[in-house]
Amino acid sequence: MNTLVVLLGPTGVGKTALSLRIARRIESPVLSADSRQLYKELVIGTAAPTADERAAVTHYLVGLLELTDYYSASRFEEDALALLQTLFKQHRAVLMAGGSMMYIDAVCRGIDNIPTVTPDIRAAVGNEYERHGLTPLLDELKQADPLHYDEVDRKNHRRVLHAVEICRMTGKPYSSFRTKTV
């Protein structure tokens, strides 16, 4: 039987040191569940494992992306589950460590089946946000999906933009893709 061991905590509390000890003890690599450590350029401020730490214990999903690369919890779920299939062929237990609860939840509980936004829709909504601000997009979201409009953090422009993107792309309310709330 395979076991996924999860170590979750905020940045800077010693997860890396503890994860190294645990990984050695259970003879496991470390699968990073940190949304910022995925990016090569975000070494400072993320408490990413050093080169020496990465040499001591194999780490996955660290320093792979450019800052301009799009990555989501849904994509993390796909990547991590595929990687776990391979790792469980070599290890009885695998340690997943990080501070991104959404990423950990995606692997452990699954994620809503929200479609990936096409680049043209993402660019159009982004351009509208830059030109006119958030208010017109909030109005659009209120019309397209009143349920999500009532729930979304209206000050978090990324969440608003994403919901509008999904509504435009699919012609359906964003909330119709959500299967659960956490």
Please give the residue ranges for each predicted region.
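Phosphate/pyrophosphate-binding catalytic cores of soluble transferases and nucleic-acid-acting enzymes
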Residues: 1-182
